[in-house]
Amino acid sequence: MSYAQTKTQTKSGYKAGVQDYRLTYYTPDYTPKDTDILAAFRVTPQPGVPFEEAAAAVAAESSTGTWTTVWTDLLTDLDRYKGRCYDIEPVPGEDNQFIAYIAYPLDLFEEGSITNVLTSIVGNVFGFKALRALRLEDIRFPVAYIKTFQGPPHGIQVERDKLNKYGRPLLGCTIKPKLGLSAKNYGRAVYECLRGGLDFTKDDENINSAPFQRWRDRFLFVADAITKAQAETGEIKGHYLNVTAPTCEEMLKRAEYAKELKQPIIMHDYLTAGFTANTTLARWCRDNGVLLHIHRAMHAVIDRQKNHGIHFRVLAKALRLSGGDHIHTGTVVGKLEGERGITMGFVDLLRENYVEQDKSRGIYFTQDWASLPGVMAVASGGIHVWHMPALVEIFGDDSVLQFGGGTLGHPWGNAPGATANRVALEACVQARNEGRNLAREGNDVIREAAKWSPELAVACELWKEIKFEFEAMDTV
């Protein structure tokens, strides 16, 4: 089209001014395509703003729209590229809240880029004045888009093959205190936990490189601890070496050094470091045969408020695409937020290949992962031996159960604390395999095992009164 033709068309087809979003972006007769990215938003409009207008504003501002009509709309095909609110449903018990379902054409997004998806869908609209609050509850990625991602570096089955460990959850421990230990004392704590029976130990999320413990020194002492523990136990062991760094270049430098030390797994804080850094590291991990543990530090800033932010199930789906072999998910029974149905909903979205819509668990869309490798769920935070039956029953085998204080707080030390957890785990797995009901008989299983394990008996006595009974905020 020539410039002259454009001028002629604008004179006849362009009308300047402001018009309601719903005239263009609210399309209740639209049927979503298999290739659309679908989003479910919990919308709280300002008083006096109609639901249809608020929903259409979200669709517009997260896709092609702006606050006024622009003549350059005539230079593109808005019907092809615009986001569409195709359905609105009320939120039970809330008079001024609703769920808006929005479809986005796939051509709006760069292939293989979670960074671009989030920049588009949640990058600007959350500050829109017409809305009191906005929360992205769920997102459906089409198979056509999933196929542009590598996903987890290895996945659950490959990890089990690397570790030669099958038929049970894996056991881990976060080294405490999280800050302040010298590299040598840190390595000592790692060794004691691993020789006591754990599969993994872990850097805490804020352990990077500090004056009291530089990253290279920590890596060296941890590598020595793992070598010694493996020689004594005959089992493959690992420690999540946190390679999160100020720059991507430094992050990859630390990852390379872990590989030189023949370490099987490294760790990354994916939200604070960002999705671009995480995808870069995940691709490096696949190319170099290293497992990748993901910590979700900062997630509660984004997902804890029920009316505003992004639900963790969206962050979990984004992580599966960006890449990670493990990710923290909460425990249901420990000190961190997490209602069982909601938690297991996003755990299924991490591990399973196909998950049906189930709004009772917060799953607004059926998700087909097109054989993308799964991510192992990590239960961590305020758990101890009395929680073991519930953890095994809730999370199943494809999980990592991480006891930080529940290992290091044992009166006899780190190794006995690790042994207590290993005995409790083995007892629960055996009882489950024999057909016993862990939900009903779990405490009996632990008591029976404690009769022949003094380490477990001491742990049971120490933590018999410890409970974290608070009402969950994360509900449908």
Swiss-Prot record:
Tell me where in this chain the PTM N6-carboxylysine is found.
Answer: K202
The cofactors required by this protein are:
Mg(2+)
Co-factor binding comment: Binds 1 Mg(2+) ion per subunit.
GO CC, alphabetical: carboxysome
Look up the record and give one Gene Ontology term from the biological process aspect: reductive pentose-phosphate cycle
PROSITE patterns linked to this entry: RUBISCO_LARGE (PS00157)
List, alphabetically, the InterPro entries matched: RuBisCO (IPR033966), RuBisCo_large_chain_AS (IPR020878), RuBisCO_lsu_C (IPR000685), RuBisCO_lsu_C_sf (IPR036376), RuBisCO_lsu_fd_N (IPR017443), RuBisCO_lsu_N_sf (IPR036422), RuBisCO_lsuI (IPR020888)
Q: What is its EC number?
A: 4.1.1.39
Give the positions of the site Transition state stabilizer.
Answer: K335
What does the induction field say? Part of the rbcL-rbcS operon, transcribed in light and constitutively during growth on fructose.
**According to its UniProt record, where is this protein located?**
Carboxysome
Q: What class of enzyme is it?
A: lyase
Question: What does the record give as the reaction this protein catalyses?
Answer: 2 (2R)-3-phosphoglycerate + 2 H(+) = D-ribulose 1,5-bisphosphate + CO2 + H2O; D-ribulose 1,5-bisphosphate + O2 = 2-phosphoglycolate + (2R)-3-phosphoglycerate + 2 H(+)
What are the protein's GO molecular function terms? magnesium ion binding; monooxygenase activity; ribulose-bisphosphate carboxylase activity
Q: Which UniProt keywords apply?
A: Bacterial microcompartment, Calvin cycle, Carbon dioxide fixation, Carboxysome, Disulfide bond, Lyase, Magnesium, Metal-binding, Monooxygenase, Oxidoreductase, Photorespiration, Photosynthesis
Describe the PTM. The disulfide bond which can form in the large chain dimeric partners within the hexadecamer appears to be associated with oxidative stress and protein turnover.
Catalytic residues as annotated in Swiss-Prot or TrEMBL: K176 (proton acceptor), H295 (proton acceptor)
Residues bound to Mg(2+) are K202, D204, E205
Extra facts: RuBisCO folding and assembly commences when the nascent large subunit folds with the help of chaperonin GroEL-GroES. Both RbcX and Raf1 help folded RbcL release from the chaperonin and dimerize; dimeric Raf1 binds to RbcL(2) leading to an RbcL8-Raf1(8) complex. RbcS displaces Raf1, resulting in holoenzyme formation. The basic functional RuBisCO is composed of a large chain homodimer in a 'head-to-tail' conformation. In form I RuBisCO this homodimer is arranged in a barrel-like tetramer with the small subunits forming a tetrameric 'cap' on each end of the 'barrel'.
Q: Describe its assembly.
A: Heterohexadecamer of 8 large chains and 8 small chains; disulfide-linked. The disulfide link is formed within the large subunit homodimers. Forms complexes of many stoichiometries with Raf1 with and without RbcS. RuBisCO interacts with the C-terminus of CcmM.
Q: What is this protein called?
A: Ribulose bisphosphate carboxylase large chain
Q: What is the lineage of its organism?
A: Bacteria, Bacillati, Cyanobacteriota, Cyanophyceae, Nostocales
